[in-house]
């Protein structure tokens, strides 16, 4: 592994780790940065699976106490069973619709106009949701009802559209359906665990021939970098939302969406090589 390849792995690991759980679309950022540093092709597809898995494992580690509490409480704690049921219920729409439509969406919607439009529209909706007066019904994820979980699960499916942002859709959905910022954000993190692990396993199996032993050092470097920066991002976001709204992220989405349109319009980024 030469210096430039190591640099590419670190940069993309940082981008994935920082953007995966912020409501700003990690996909759009990965495409822009990967093109700018010349990291593409089949190796990039396999590499993306690895760094996404690293990011979700960072969340698993960050919330390990809650996970252990739920797992060991399933047999005797009603709140643990309710939480697990809500998580599975919210997860199912993405499974069904993902299997049915993922390939079609990847083929027909993965273009700069779609990504930019999703970023801008999502940013506008985020601003509206933050400024809209709504009654908080749920302050803690343990107090969610099954109806909250199911609605958030369907909202998460919007993230199949490039540029929407999985975390952005679930967090804003949670806010609109009566969750506090903290509860909506934490449930988004928990919902990411089965959703992203499932997606990584599915993609890993589908593209298993792309994984080559010679790429192991590159993958390992990207994995470690993504894990570390994802943990930093998760902790920072939880602290940020304690005293701030999501308005800053909304404006960032809008600006970034316009930036993507500019890169496409002026040919700064070759979107024809993007793989998602």
From Swiss-Prot:
GO terms for molecular function: undecaprenyl-diphosphatase activity. Its EC number is 3.6.1.27. It is found in: Cell inner membrane. The chain crosses the membrane at residues 43-63, 85-105, 109-129, 183-203, 214-234, 249-269. Its main location: membrane. It is a multi-pass membrane protein. It is an enzyme of class 3 (hydrolase). InterPro entries: UppP. Keywords: Antibiotic resistance, Cell inner membrane, Cell membrane, Cell shape, Cell wall biogenesis/degradation, Hydrolase, Membrane, Peptidoglycan synthesis, Transmembrane, Transmembrane helix. GO terms for biological process: cell wall organization; peptidoglycan biosynthetic process; regulation of cell shape; response to antibiotic. GO terms for cellular component: plasma membrane. It catalyses: di-trans,octa-cis-undecaprenyl diphosphate + H2O = di-trans,octa-cis-undecaprenyl phosphate + phosphate + H(+). NCBIfam families: PRK00281.1-2, PRK00281.1-4, undec_PP_bacA. Bacitracin is thought to be involved in the inhibition of peptidoglycan synthesis by sequestering undecaprenyl diphosphate, thereby reducing the pool of lipid carrier available. Catalyzes the dephosphorylation of undecaprenyl diphosphate (UPP). Confers resistance to bacitracin. Belongs to the UppP family. This is Undecaprenyl-diphosphatase.
